[in-house]
Amino acid sequence: MNYVPNKKIINTMQTAICTVFEKDYHYGVGALANSLYHHGFRGIVWAGYRGNTPHWAKFLKTENGYQEFSLGEGCAIRFVKLTTPKHLGFYKPDFMCQLWENYCPDIDALFYFDPDIVNKCEWDFYENWVSRGIALCGDSWYLVPANHPRRLAWKEFAQNNGFVCERELDYHYNSGFIGVHKNYKSILEIWQKLEELGEIAGYANLQDLYNNNTFNRYPYLYGDQTYLNLALMLTNYPLSTVGPDGMDFVPGGTIMSHATVPHIKPWRKKLLFSALNGNSPTITDKLYWRHSQTPIQLYSMAKILWQKFEILCGSALGRFIRRAPM
């Protein structure tokens, strides 16, 4: 009988993960790291932060330019202090470029996750995914046709700044996750450049992610996400995309779960109060608390038991009390 080697064993792709956070978003970083570790990720999570390192990151080892926290066998979080005045949402492409240039130049692929995401699938799925193209998840605002007036305005902005549109896209992708192979990493520089051009033109304030003056003002460049989607139009790099189910924006997702605006972050949510107001615990809420203790212990056991009680009661209340859809 011929021996067929395990694909996980022969896979030699070198990958890393990164995120950025400040304030209480460290809770999300902990749950994200736990969920990735639980599903087989072994390697380095680079965490750019503003403020202080998390209270749960004990026994930090200081290295050249970062502090390392051991997560478990073969896995660590490396905290990189950020001094940028930019809103961290706008800093995503900068941080990824900085990592590739100064911290992990030899990796084959780099993944960014927002710190309010919880992973749901095995890590080898991501490595296979990014080998097929730039990995992306559809946004809740998914269908944005090539002839949509907002997309045409984005295109005009790019052309007025010397860019050429390489392809037409009909779908809109969430900037809370991206996986980039080293062959396509210049997409990050384009994303970064577009944001900076937007600020120069007065269409963005890079210290204010959701400037209310931009969403309804031509050319409708709103937050970092619009600039990412525009950057995708300006290259012909292959894309490998999933729909909004990829982040649990619609039922049936199996990849990750994302607590986006306007939802309250799981670590802040009063689950019983929310359920009494017609909002029962979400999939993301449940996953967050499921991955809040191992291998990183984010809370006391008393807190965890109370949250399990709130999830149980909140889910039961949700069968009888439900907010009417918009």
Could you describe each region identified by the protein language model?
Residues Y3-H87, E101-D106, S300-M326:
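N-terminal anchoring/stem segment of glycosyltransferases
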Residues I10-T12, N119, C165-E168, N174, ...:
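A glycosyltransferase accessory/donor-loop signature
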Residues V29-G30, G89, P93, S175, ...:
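Conserved glycosyltransferase catalytic-site signature
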Residues H38-R42, E101-A109, D114-D116, H181-I187, ...:
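Secondary-structure boundary elements
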Residues W46-G48, A109-D114, N119, L136, ...:
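A structural signal for short, well-ordered beta-strand segments and their strand-loop junctions
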Residues A57-G65, P145-N161, I200-F215:
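Charged, glycine/proline-rich intrinsically disordered loops and linkers
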Residues F90-P145:
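GT-A fold catalytic core of metal-dependent nucleotide-sugar glycosyltransferases
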Residues E127-K193:
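Conserved catalytic core of nucleotide-sugar-dependent glycosyltransferases
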